[in-house]
Amino acid sequence: MSYSMMRSINLIVIHCSATREDKSFTEYDLDICHRRRGFNGTGYHFYIRKNGDIKSTRPIEKIGAHVRGFNSESIGICYEGGLDCEGQPKDTRTEWQKHSLRVLILTLLRDYPGCR
C-alpha cells in the first residue's frame, strides 16, 4: 500500500537536532528527548545520522509533531547536529548527511508529487 494514499502530504520540513557537532546524538537519544518534552515518541518521520544513515523514526502515515500548524500535511526530517562545539548555530551537515538528505527528499518528492 502506498503511504501517499493514507494522508495528504504537501510539505517536507527539514530540521536539525540542535546538538553539538562534537557529540553523538542517536535516534534513541532523540526519542527520549521528545518523550521528556511530552510527545509520544520522536516527532520527526526520519532522522539522518552524521554517517548518513537514514533512520525511520515515525511512520509516515502517523501525523508528526515537528512544526505547529503544519503537522497534519507534512513529513518531518531531522539531521543530527546543527550546533558547533561551543553550542552556537552552524551548518554541521556532513557530506554523508547532505547526500542522504538529497536522496531522501528526491524519493519523497517522487512518492508525494506536489510537495514543497
Say what each PLM segment does:
Residues 1-115:
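Active-site-adjacent loop/helix surface patches within enzyme catalytic domains
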